[in-house]
Amino acid sequence: MAWSGGKDIVDQIFDAGYWLVSKSAVLSDEIKNHVEKSIESISGKISNKETPRLQENDSNRSKVYKTLRIGLQDHWKLGLGISATSLCLYLGYRTFFKLPPNLPEAESQVVLILGDMNDPIIRNQVMDLYRRRFTVYICTENADVYKKHEEDQDFIYYIDPTCEKDFEGFFVDVPRLASILFMPRLSYHPSGVISCDSLESEIHSSIFVYYQALLSIIPHLKRKTQLIMFNPSLTADLNLVHHSTEIITSGIIDSLFKIFKEYQRLNVSTIKLGILQIGSQPSNYKFLRMAGSDIHEALHYPVYKMIMSANGYKLRQLLSWLTTLGGYNSVYYCGRFSYLVSWPFASLIFNHHTRLSLKRLRGRLAKVYSSIISFFCRSSSKSSK
């Protein structure tokens, strides 16, 4: 069977299924005729033999062959139908539900990232989408610096958030946008108390510049578009007050998430980030001195799955709608301890003011355990005496 390259993948699958079912039907007819002829010839030979001693055995054999013949005539269609249905379900699962590792070459999807490429997490996210064959547009304040090397990178383009010409060209070149990733600065060092000017500059360059750019993009969206907001919320959830910049950033992202949920043209989700690790070093929350989750498994693949679920086949979109309870549950947790800190009293375990880190907690639990064991040992020795 020759595959037609111009047909849609769904048409090719149904053509393949029709071809397979038709060939299976022809083959089953030939097998049925051959079995019937064999049974008739064997029955004829048995009936022609005049052996009184084996007359009872011959009658039993003829009954068995007759039963097999009737069974083949009645149930061959059922078996063929079950086989064809199983094959269609398997092909449907591989086509509509199972995600390929990369975007198929025939598909072209555009992702817009609002963030600074100097941040290691943002830079790794951009390169992961690029490796998965997405066309990536990056809206960053340092666009002029990266545009000098734009010719050396296919499918990666840069937009200056303050340049109207860049946005005009973007609206012309990109008629359909798959997803928007709102990524403020995600990797911080302990900031402590900083001046108002430094805090204002940091918040403006990390959030408000991209917030203004997003407001200018929303009126040009022709359909409901996915918006994923990244929130460095671990510091705020742990009540670490000496990380003021990160806490304020997390609070602003929470507020913007609630605001954008009211927009009809946006399908908004937020990702609360835990500890992520690039290579052998943690890339964020370094003050906790803990190993993080691998960024490829903990962040890159979930983001890729979210994009494909919102822009894939209708069955995949339906499955995503069911798993998120109709879009009601739109908060995702990526990275180590990201979901754990949402539990009550989780901050007491990590908070420096209570002087309870994981190592100290483990040491205290070990002491309590040893004291309990020693108590029971003493009581047992006294009872034996």
From Swiss-Prot:
GO CC annotation: mitochondrial outer membrane; mitochondrion
UniProt KW keywords: Membrane, Mitochondrion, Mitochondrion outer membrane
Membrane topology annotation: Peripheral membrane protein
> Quick check: keyword Mitochondrion in the entry?
yes
UniProt lists the family membership as follows: Belongs to the UPF0744 family.
Q: What is this protein called?
A: UPF0744 protein YSC83
Give the principal location in a single coarse category.
mitochondrion
Q: Where is it located? A: Mitochondrion outer membrane
rRNA-binding among the record's keywords?
no
Write down the species.
Saccharomyces cerevisiae (strain ATCC 204508 / S288c) (Baker's yeast)
| Pfam families in the cross-refs | DUF1776 (PF08643)
